[in-house]
């Protein structure tokens, strides 16, 4: 063996050892803020993590989104989000709500997803009671005036036009429509245009009555907040919220979301680039291998021409895409739901490169399932740990994390548990999960743009179990 070879082998061994050590001492994570949870008599769960400071975030997280709609009222959850800020008897106009929040230096935000809705505020600690009062008022006493509903239609229609102009939004909506055909997850969050134009006050109120029940509400807070005081405030302000007569589990059991391998393409030769996604059925929130698939997502990575690293990036697929000039960008996504999920790649490329790009993506899936190594697994575990543990920093992120995890898992994951579960992932775990989910499967495929060169579906499916030469 030459001296150069000996030096290379020695360097490789040192490199391997550097990743085999624990680079983070997790003991400090055991002293993270305690999550206190109290369940009220009407089913509302109040959860807090108290830290020192002057600021607190408090929010209401609702186990209700577009998945609980029908074809007839699809879009009502999102419409409700818009209307919730339009006035109550106590705060009769949108301006009165905004002024009150601004006068106490706070902020109010909301979102609607396929499974959840959320309304949350960030305020100084002395204003937490005011925040609870505002949230309880808008969620229970909104007037939903017909004139304001008519005005808001135009706003939502404009929002829909904007979304339809964003290729990534269109691709992911089409991906859901293809993967979950004829099911609740296949619908869009905004709903079809005809529904936006026709949703009524009665439909909005009915949706609240059916879905905004105590057993489906989590009120979470983080930062400078006292748990016992918040519990008393919620007891008072949300006393009129009732338990559901039909449990959420019974309602959800009636909703089927079977994954269907399929394709949905929209050809538009006037567009300069192809936007596409290829995805497989993934894991739900509660699956024990959740963090393994998160790690696989990290390993496959993301890339775009604007990143500073250029071609010098850690991701194997990213290096190939950059070196061979295959794409303008690509990303890896893992979207979780209660009983299923989507995992895959989204890509943007020139029409003549799409065949090679799709092939390399699926080749990378197979490589991870069969021959990924310890060094890349350990390196990406550190990256995943960093991005995941950052979600435990900052009152807004912590408040959101508490609400989401209690809705999806029924409990709060501590930073120490997250660290332990990620740190214990092995190469064998990665290969096992990748082999199960990413090999020899029928994917869902969507593409828009000049797609004449997009590979035939049978080729895409075939590339999940054999490599193109």
Swiss-Prot record:
Pfam hit, one: Peptidase_M16
Q: What is its EC number?
A: 3.4.24.64
What is this protein's expression induced by? Antisense RNA inhibition of the mppB gene induces gene expression of nuclear-encoded mitochondrial proteins (mppA and cxdA) and surprisingly also of the mppB gene itself. These results suggest that antisense RNA inhibition of mppB induces gene expression of mitochondrial proteins, presumably in a retrograde signaling manner. Up-regulated by Pseudomonas aeruginosa, PAO1 strain and PA14 strain infection.
Which InterPro entries does its entry note? Answer: Metalloenz_LuxS/M16, MPP/UQCRC_Complex, Pept_M16_N, Pept_M16_Zn_BS, Peptidase_M16_C
Q: Where in the cell is it found?
A: Mitochondrion inner membrane; Mitochondrion matrix
- TM regions (residue ranges): none
Q: Is Zinc one of the keywords UniProt gives this record? A: yes
Q: What does the record note as the disruption phenotype of the gene behind this chain? A: Disruption of the mppB is lethal.
User: Any one Gene Ontology biological process term?
Assistant: mitochondria-nucleus signaling pathway
Family from the record = Belongs to the peptidase M16 family.
Name of protein:
Mitochondrial-processing peptidase subunit beta
Q: What is the lineage of its organism?
A: Eukaryota, Amoebozoa, Evosea, Eumycetozoa, Dictyostelia
């Amino acid at each position: 063996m030459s001296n150069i070879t000996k030096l290379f082998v020695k360097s490789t061994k040192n490199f391997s050892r550097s990743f085999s050590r624990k680079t983070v001492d997790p003991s400090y994570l055991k002293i993270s803020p305690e999550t206190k949870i109290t369940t009220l008599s009407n089913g509302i769960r109040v959860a807090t993590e108290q830290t020192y400071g002057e600021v607190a975030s408090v929010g209401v997280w609702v186990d209700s989104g577009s998945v609980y709609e029908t074809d007839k009222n699809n879009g009502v959850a999102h419409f409700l989000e818009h209307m919730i800020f339009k006035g109550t008897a106590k705060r009769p106009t949108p301006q009165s709500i905004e002024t009150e929040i601004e006068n106490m230096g706070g902020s109010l935000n909301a979102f609607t997803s396929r499974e959840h809705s959320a309304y949350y505020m960030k305020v100084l600690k002395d204003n937490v009671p005011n925040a609870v009062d505002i949230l309880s008022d808008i969620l229970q006493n909104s007037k939903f005036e017909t004139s304001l509903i008519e005005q808001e239609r135009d706003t939502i229609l404009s929002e829909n036009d904007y979304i339809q102009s964003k290729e990534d939004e269109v691709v992911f909506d089409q991906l859901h429509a293809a993967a979950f055909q004829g099911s609740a997850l296949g619908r869009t969050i905004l709903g079809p245009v005809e529904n936006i134009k026709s949703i009524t006050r009665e439909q909005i109120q009915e949706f609240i009555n059916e879905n905004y029940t105590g057993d489906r509400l989590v009120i979470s807070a983080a930062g400078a907040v006292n748990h016992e005081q918040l519990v008393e405030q919620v007891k008072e302000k949300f006393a009129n919220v009732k338990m559901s007569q039909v449990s959420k589990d019974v309602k959800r059991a009636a909703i089927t979301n079977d994954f269907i391998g399929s394709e949905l393409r929209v050809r538009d030769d006037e567009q300069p680039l192809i936007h596409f996604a290829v995805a497989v059925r993934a894991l739900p929130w509660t699956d024990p291998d959740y963090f393994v698939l998160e790690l696989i997502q990290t390993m496959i990575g993301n890339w775009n021409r604007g990143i500073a690293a250029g071609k010098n990036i850690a991701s194997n697929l990213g290096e190939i895409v950059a070196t061979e000039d295959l794409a303008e960008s690509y990303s890896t996504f893992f979207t979780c739901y209660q009983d299923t999920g989507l995992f895959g790649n989204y890509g943007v490329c020139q029409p003549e490169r799409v065949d090679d790009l799709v092939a390399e993506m699926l080749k990378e899936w197979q490589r991870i399932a069969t021959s990924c190594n310890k060094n890349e697994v350990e390196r990406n575990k550190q990256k995943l740990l960093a991005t995941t543990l950052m979600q435990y920093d900052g009152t807004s992120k912590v408040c959101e994390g508490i609400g989401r995890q209690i809705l999806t898992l029924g409990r709060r994951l501590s930073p120490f548990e997250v660290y332990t579960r990620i740190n214990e992932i092995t190469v064998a775990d990665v290969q096992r999960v990748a082999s199960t989910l990413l090999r020899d499967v029928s994917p869902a495929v969507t593409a828009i743009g000049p797609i004449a060169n997009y590979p035939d579906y049978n080729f895409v499916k075939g590339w999940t179990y054999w490599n193109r030469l």
